[in-house]
A protein has these predicted regions:
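Class I SAM-dependent methyltransferase SAM/SAH-binding core
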Residues: 52-97
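Residues lining the SAM
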Residues: 110-112, 143
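Conserved class I S-adenosyl-L-methionine
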Residues: 1-41
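Class I SAM-dependent methyltransferase "Motif I" SAM/SAH-binding loop
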Residues: 47-49
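A short glycine-rich, Lys/Arg-flanked "PGG" loop and its adjoining helix->strand segment in the class I
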Residues: 124-136
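SAM-dependent methyltransferase
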Residues: 143-219
């Protein structure tokens, strides 16, 4: 089987929601919602995936569109939307090639979606695309993660299991990661297994080398500055408190000038 050019496919996409569980109380949900309520609609959810934010906000009457580069994730989003009697505008595009029919008051890029841009030439291009898709005075809100700091181990691994509701099968996910300080890039290997009666009946491995780019707070702010954003602020995790120097998760917000 030829490996798709997008990261989320196959068992990884199928069991994405299962491993995330109930996300209704996640802090980022309330943070994004507060920004939308303050700065307005329409909204674009970049890297919308299976619709965690998109469908939630649509149910609240928010005018929001979604874009993702994975057809597998978008298909799952459509299935979930149909069950909720929702018809979202969904677009399959890569964010550095973003070309949508309308502009937005608020653009959200949840999770680590922006950090999946691995070619160093793509982040500034993508910031320009976001800028062009904002209405004058519109805002761009993105979280960032600093994946590694001096003294951290370079390698790590973990295993998680969940139960598939339909048949009681155990779904096991194992991940190995290695960080490269010289490039600020992380490699990952993810293995998904479906287990029934103590036997592995299906397995799929995803190798991404590299998989994710790490950003310091200074690098994230520079992206906004270089793209022409103004009123840039950096927040502690998913709060409106000022960022702390030691924060590994933080959100950046900036505005396209009027």
């Amino acid at each position: 089987m030829t490996t798709p050019s997008y990261e989320y496919y196959g068992l990884m996409a199928e069991f994405w929601d299962l491993f995330r569980g109930d996300t209704s109380t996640w802090e980022d949900r309330f943070f994004y919602l507060a920004n939308v309520e303050k700065f307005g609609q329409p909204v674009l959810d970049v890297g919308c995936g299976t619709g965690r934010i998109l469908l939630d906000f649509m149910q609240q009457g928010i005018d929001i569109d979604g874009v993702d580069n994975s057809p597998d994730m978008l298909a799952l989003c459509k299935q979930k939307a149909e069950k909720l009697n929702l018809t979202p505008n969904l677009y399959q595009q890569e964010m550095h090639k973003l070309s949508l029919p309308r502009k937005y008051q608020t653009i959200l890029v949840p999770s680590s979606s922006f950090q999946l841009l691995l070619d160093p030439a793509l982040p500034p291009v993508t910031m320009d695309r976001f800028y062009e898709h904002l209405l004058p005075g519109g805002t761009l809100v993105m979280p960032f993660m600093t994946l590694w700091k001096e003294g951290d181990p370079l390698e790590g691994e973990w295993t998680r299991e969940a139960t598939r509701r339909e048949d009681g099968a155990t779904i096991r996910r194992w991940q190995y990661s290695r960080f490269h300080p010289d490039t600020s890039l992380e490699d990952t290997i993810d293995r998904y297994e479906i287990i029934r009666d103590d036997k592995v009946i299906a397995s799929e491995e995803h190798r991404q080398s590299p998989a994710t780019r790490s950003y310091t707070q200074e690098q994230a702010v520079a992206l906004y500055q270089n793209a022409g954003f103004k009123g840039i602020r950096v927040f502690h995790e998913f709060t409106f408190d000022p960022v702390k120097p030691e924060d590994r998760t933080y959100c950046v917000r900036g505005f396209r000038p009027e």
